[in-house]
């Protein structure tokens, strides 16, 4: 090791411009480069050399070639289906598809007169706009289940609960108990 660190009295004017910390860093870097060259590694000037030469250090880029490759762009729908399958979301996606794409699943004519409200445990609740449409949907329930199974898969919807328009009621919720019965309202 050479330099002005061993002999502080030499080159005082030059040392005043350079700090001893920078000199120590430069010596350490030079020693690391020399050790890298001794191991047979590239001991360039770091990022400055790679930017100046125009290529990034490391493995060269290889092109995929003319055939299909895993790195080729994939359709978004296919990627989403594969992600749902890997994560176990397929059933939930199919349930959402029944509710979200109702008109595409059952047809526009039925979708104009009936709408799904909930899908719980394989039971799809559907509200028809009139009692006539509710009756018609109950008659064609098997065909509706077949259409839904063809669109989203088997065992997503196992049965339908079809109701007509709601009449005025003071009951809240699907279950209830009998009230107090008729009362004397004429005080």
From Swiss-Prot:
Any Pfam family: DciA
Record field: compositional bias (Basic and acidic residues): 1-17, 24-45
Source organism superkingdom: Bacteria
Family matches, as InterPro entries: DciA-like (IPR007922), UPF0232_actinobac (IPR023007)
Residue span of region Disordered: 1-75, 168-187
Family: Belongs to the UPF0232 family.
NCBIfam families associated with the record: PRK03195.1
Protein name: UPF0232 protein MRA_0004
Species name: Mycobacterium tuberculosis (strain ATCC 25177 / H37Ra)
Upper lineage: Bacteria, Bacillati, Actinomycetota, Actinomycetes, Mycobacteriales
């Amino acid at each position: 090791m050479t330099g002005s660190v061993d002999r502080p009295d030499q080159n005082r004017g030059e040392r005043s411009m350079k700090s001893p910390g920078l000199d120590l860093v430069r010596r350490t870097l030079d020693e690391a480069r020399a050790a890298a060259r001794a191991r047979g590694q590239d001991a360039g000037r770091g990022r400055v050399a790679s930017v100046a030469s125009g290529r990034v250090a490391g493995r060269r880029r290889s092109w995929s070639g003319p055939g299909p490759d895993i790195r080729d762009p994939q359709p978004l729908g296919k990627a989403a289906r594969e992600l749902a399958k890997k994560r176990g979301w397929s059933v939930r996606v199919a349930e959402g598809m029944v509710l979200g794409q109702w008109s595409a699943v059952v047809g526009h004519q039925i979708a104009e007169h009936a709408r799904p409200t909930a899908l719980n445990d394989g039971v799809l609740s559907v509200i028809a706009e009139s009692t006539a449409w509710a009756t018609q949907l109950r008659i064609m329930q098997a065909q509706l289940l077949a259409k839904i199974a063809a669109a989203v898969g088997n065992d997503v919807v196992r049965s339908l609960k079809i109701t007509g328009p709601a009449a005025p009621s003071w009951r809240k919720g699907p279950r209830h108990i009998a009230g107090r019965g008729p009362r004397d309202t004429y005080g």
